Amino acid sequence: MNRLLQRQLFLENLLVGVNSTFHQM
């Protein structure tokens, strides 16, 4: 359960990072 939550948080952070990079371009 904890591992699943960690992966979800990681995916959300990754998506936010990609969005930030995309907006900076």
From Swiss-Prot:
Alphabetically ordered keywords of this record: Host cytoplasm, Host mitochondrion
Subcellular location as annotated: Host cytoplasm; Host mitochondrion
GO (cellular component) term, any one: host cell mitochondrion
Cystine pairs: none
InterPro entries, per the entry: Rotavirus_NSP6
Subunit details: Interacts with NSP2 and NSP5.
Family as reported in the entry's similarity comment: Belongs to the rotavirus A NSP6 family.
Protein name as annotated: Non-structural protein 6
Organism: Rotavirus A (isolate RVA/Human/United States/WI61/1983/G9P1A[8])
